[in-house]
Regions:
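Aromatic-rich carbohydrate-recognition surfaces in CAZymes
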Residues: 1-82, 100-114, 118
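Beta-strand segments within the central parallel beta-sheet cores of soluble alpha/beta enzyme folds
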Residues: 2, 64-71, 126-136, 185-188
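Extended ligand-binding clefts on enzyme/binding-domain cores
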Residues: 6-31, 35-41, 100-108, 135-231, ...
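A sequence-level detector of short, solvent-exposed, charge-rich linear segments
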Residues: 20, 89, 96, 126, ...
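Alpha-helix capping and helix-loop boundary segments enriched in small/acidic/polar residues
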Residues: 33-41, 57-68, 84-105, 121-129, ...
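Well-ordered alpha-helical scaffold segments within catalytic/enzyme domains
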Residues: 45-61, 106-124, 165-179, 212-225, ...
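C-terminal ends of transmembrane alpha-helices
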Residues: 79-87, 143-146
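Terminal, non-catalytic domain-edge segments
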Residues: 232, 247, 252-283
């Protein structure tokens, strides 16, 4: 899946300094068709997934083939990722949002991932620079996002909250960038703010996303807390009145399907399995 995005950028057909959202509409891979860019979102995705491949393979050979563009993308995130401008993230149905704390979290994880790749490729200077950068950004993120017993939806929006599921990669990839207290505080807040059929994405709506919530649940320290966050999703899947292939965007109050069905994002519900798999790989 990553090959096509790499080729699109490396060939010069994609001119922007961040990763493309797509390469076309099936069956034609003749250029991005999505109308709104997701600069930090997609650039972060490419770096994080390349890091995951390296850890799964036990080497960074794949990353080495694309090092020039990975470096360019990492520098881009270093410049704009701490406090993203008004742009879309993967929840594009919720619209644009500036200073998005969860999007910033993705940038931090991606920069840390690049640091890990550099370490695996015996590039100590780059490894030290980007790993330390990610750690500084994490501390700054905590300062800007702190809202008492949780962290904000956006840095400039006190009294708000959102799932920070992008931080799951610190645990899954073994990056060790975040202070432990960040995930602990977030998960404790999630457990107190669930609805009958799951945890809303943020305070603006009562919508839920199956894949995102499993990522958030995977951040939990204990199996009990993980199960507590998963149980309402199981209830949604079993009790939804919408008899369709699994809908990943749904209403947490009544289990009604909102939109999206049988999509590839359902693969995200296997995050806990990926966590176990990569944890064993790192031993």
């Amino acid at each position: 899946m990553l090959d096509f995005i790499f080729d699109y950028s490396e060939s010069g057909r994609w001119k922007k300094p961040f990763a493309a959202h797509d390469v076309g509409t099936y069956p034609l891979a003749n250029g991005q068709t999505y109308q709104g860019d997701m600069p930090v979102e997609e650039t972060g995705n490419m770096l994080i997934m390349t890091t995951a491949i390296a850890i799964a393979d036990g080497n960074a050979d794949y990353a080495a083939k694309h090092w020039e563009i990975l470096t360019a993308w990492s520098n881009y995130l270093a410049e704009v990722g701490m406090d993203p401008e008004n742009q879309l993230c993967t929840e594009d149905f919720a619209g644009h949002l500036a200073h998005n704390a969860n999007l910033s979290a993705k940038a931090i994880m991606a920069i840390a991932g690049y640091g890990r790749l550099a370490e695996m490729l015996n590039k100590p200077k780059e490894a030290k620079k980007f790993t330390e950068m990610a750690k500084r950004m994490a501390i700054e993120w905590e300062r800007r996002a702190d809202d008492g017993d949780h962290y904000r939806l956006a840095f400039d929006m006190p009294g708000t909250w959102s799932q920070k599921y992008n931080f799951v990669w610190d645990k899954v990839l073994g990056l060790d960038i975040l202070p432990d207290r960040i995930m602990k505080k977030e998960v404790a807040f999630y457990l107190k703010n669930q609805n009958k059929y799951g945890l809303p994405l943020d305070n603006r709506f009562t919508w839920g996303k199956t894949d995102d919530t499993v990522w958030s649940a995977t951040m939990a320290d204990s199996e009990g807390d993980f199960q507590e966050l998963i149980r309402p999703i199981w209830k949604y899947v079993n009790e939804t009145p919408s008899r369709i292939p699994l809908g990943d965007w749904y209403e947490t109050l009544n289990a009604d399907y909102i939109n999206f069905r049988a999509r590839s994002v359902v693969g995200g519900v296997f995050m806990k399995s990926l966590d176990h798999y990569l944890r064993n790989k790192r031993k």
